[in-house]
Amino acid sequence: MANLGCWMLVLFVATWSDLGLCKKRPKPGGWNTGGSRYPGQGSPGGNLYPPQGGGWGQPHGGGWGQPHGGGWGQPHGGSWGQPHGGGWGQGGGTHNQWNKPSKPKTSMKHVAGAAAAGAVVGGLGGYMLGSAMSRPLIHFGNDYEDRYYRENMYRYPNQVYYRPVDQYSNQNNFVHDCVNITIKQHTVTTTTKGENFTETDVKMMERVVEQMCITQYERESQAYYQRGSSMVLFSSPPVILLISFLIFLIVG
């Protein structure tokens, strides 16, 4: 809190100094006038610039022979043959314009990425789908199973289903629930595609998913702790009072 108070004091002094400088800034203008560098009236010896920004023979800022700022032969600022500023062959509307940009299409990769970053999965009672992970390298104690795992690891899940960590009393309960729901969902989804799992597959999936669920628990616990720390910090009365005072100075 001492370091926080020092930083808040520095922020207060910087804000107060900036407000003082804003009040002392001179008004914009030209040299020794306080106004425009090329005034439209009152210039000694006449004004070399037209008062309304037009060229030769332009009463209202348009091109040659333009009464109101349009192109050649344009009465009101449109393109050639346009009476009121529209596109080619248009009377001022914005429909059917040439080279009109099309609306960007939503990429399926973006949709999949959003669903894989902890989104709630519908139909699973509040379970969320974690982000994709690299399958861990696990040794099962014999050469056959180690080789079998290396050859079939791509068939096993690389994402886990889980509930928020604040709904569990400890890590073991979180991991147990995470393993069960993940294997169940992966088995059902894969079986409907015509692929079956042997007992060896299930055994290996349990080991793989368990490691992934432990990793997911550590990530979620860290994020939950950081959110809680931020809430405690900004809910303390001194910090709230100081922030309110700074907002009052800036807005006022």
Swiss-Prot record:
- The segments carrying the sequence repeats are 51-58, 59-66, 67-74, 75-82, 83-90
Where is the secretion signal located?
1-22
User: Which residues are noted in the entry as Cu(2+) 2-binding?
Assistant: 68-70
Ranges for the region named Interaction with GRB2, ERI3 and SYN1 are 23-229
Instruction: Kindly list the residues that the UniProt entry marks as GPI-anchor amidated serine lipid attachment points.
Output: 229
Give positions of region: 5 X 8 AA tandem repeats of P-H-G-G-G-W-G-Q.
Answer: 51-90
Those residues forming the propeptide, per the database entry, are: 230-252
> Would you tell me the protein name for this molecule?
Major prion protein
Native source species? Sapajus apella
